[in-house]
Amino acid sequence: GFPDWLVKKEKRGELALRTDDPEYLKYVDIFFTEIAEQADGYMHKDGGPVIGIQIENEYGHAGGPSDREEGMAHMHTLRAMAEEKGLTAPYYSATGWGGAYVPESFLPVLGGYVDAPWANHTHELAASENFLFQPFHDDANIASDFSEGQSGFTFDAAEFPYLTAELGG
């Protein structure tokens, strides 16, 4: 999430979060600078263990512009800003489920859970297919509390390996 003071700036109309708004990107630049300083020497290119970077989280599913083209462009903006700061890795990932934006050159990552504390009910959940051996998984129950989210994929699932960012037991 974002710090309260930044969310308040959006509520006052001073910036638009999770867009290419220059005022928002000013804070992204500061944030990426801090991360780059702390990650110095840990990137794969420097012999470190960091081989992947997730630029955004649930972007296009739970936040961000409703226009996919604008959302995809913003993801590329964030990646370029990260790379400019030295935050480079062999792999860049993006949330792949729920219509989240997965631009070209990003690996989609999915997730699955045994429980769904965000669900609007208390009845027993069906067993999750995410814990079975099969070629591809998409847990439709993840973030089912977000009605503004989009459904489906913004990438061709046949073109990518099955990777997870969230697999909770």
Language model feature labels by segment:
Residues 2-27, 35-169:
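Substrate-binding/catalytic cleft of secreted carbohydrate-active enzymes
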Residues 30:
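Alpha/beta-hydrolase active-site loop
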